[in-house]
Amino acid sequence: MAGHSQFKNIMHRKGRQDAVRSKMFSKLAREITVAAKSGTPDPSMNPRLRLAIQNAKAVSMPKDNIQRAINKASMGDAENYEAVRYEGYGPGGVAVIVEALTDNRNRSASNVRAAFTKAGGAMGETGSVSFMWDRVGEIYYPASAGSADKVMEAAIEAGADDVESDEEGHTIYCAFENLGEVSKALEAALGEAESVKLIWRPQNNVPVDEERAQSLMKLVATLEDDDDVQSVYANFEVDDETLAKLSAA
């Protein structure tokens, strides 16, 4: 079975072709500003800011944009964004977690609820689905970082818990409290990662057919298109044949 992480790769490839880059940069800038405001504007002293900058650089966000986002926090010119989490069910009973940074909780909740409803799902209370997930660190390297064996060896040495490798690259998982330590050790062995972040990893996935997978893709895309939404997670999987069809679509 092809997991949700592979399915997300399809969406990300399509996104690079179709999405407006300014929207991606806007979301990254918001995380940088919030990270800088929550601690010091010096990334060497602020782990959250350091990771936010690293992830922005990985998608070629201009240095001026990054610095402007940091300055916005240090000059006290930042909106009062807060982190919120929404949970619910999409088509086929698939559990969905939505993370957002917003300056208006009512607006964000209304938009997320509308997306769930339009897709035939329903938004629930906080905690309604998150018990089916684990909060973990995720570190991603492209295939060029090395062979699966090389990355596995480096991950074990760094104290990671799991590695998934395919033709696209290597996804390394670790305990959320060890993310900084593990990513630093991996950087020494493999170079700078393409992304380093905290994620929700499903304990189990729900198998879905092609029609339902398309509905879920549409729901996730709608949610990710919202300016306040930073991340979307869904616990489903599709078989290899369906994955191939979706990749070709």
From Swiss-Prot:
Keywords: Cytoplasm, DNA-binding, Transcription, Transcription regulation. GO terms for molecular function: DNA binding. Pfam families: TACO1_YebC_N (PF20772), Transcrip_reg (PF01709). One of its GO terms (cellular component) is cytosol. Its main location: cytoplasm. It comes from the Bacteria. It is found in: Cytoplasm. Belongs to the TACO1 family. This is Probable transcriptional regulatory protein mll3945. It comes from Mesorhizobium japonicum (strain LMG 29417 / CECT 9101 / MAFF 303099).
